[in-house]
Amino acid sequence: MTDARQAASRRAVLFGATAIGLCAVWTRTADAEEATLTPDAALAKVQSGEILLIDVRTPDEWARTGLPEGGTALDMRRDDFTQALLALAEGQTDRPIALICASGGRSGHMTRELSRAGFTRIIDVPEGMLGSRAGPGWLERGLPVTQP
């Protein structure tokens, strides 16, 4: 093979590798963007049965503010949290599950932890119940709550 052909072949390989790498980055970015919901979207999806909405806050917090309508209370401090969540998801680690807390910190943390534990469709509601940098939150948006 001539030097010119070898150089052209190397460029083609590098171009292909770069294109594949860019596609992988784009795909991961798209997945990350899909892994959050606004409170309005979470309410719509829980009402339509598309997601299981889990409030990971404490019983004291639930008593003060109520639970998001359609949500299930599951204190993230429970020793059996993962097993209890799996039971609520009827054993389906691929079931879409949205997590909400007060302001997005704990739900974000648990989103990562549950993904590491094998759950494949965990979604964060980063505004939380009280609001955060992500937005005003469930309560400020005037979304419905139920008492625990």
Q: What are these model-predicted stretches?
A:
Residues 100:
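Short, surface-exposed ligand- or partner-binding patches at beta-edge/loop junctions that are enriched
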Residues 53-56:
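Short hydrophobic beta-strand that contains or immediately precedes a catalytic carboxylate
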Residues 2-11, 15-48, 59-96, 105-148:
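Rhodanese-like catalytic fold shared by cysteine-dependent sulfurtransferases
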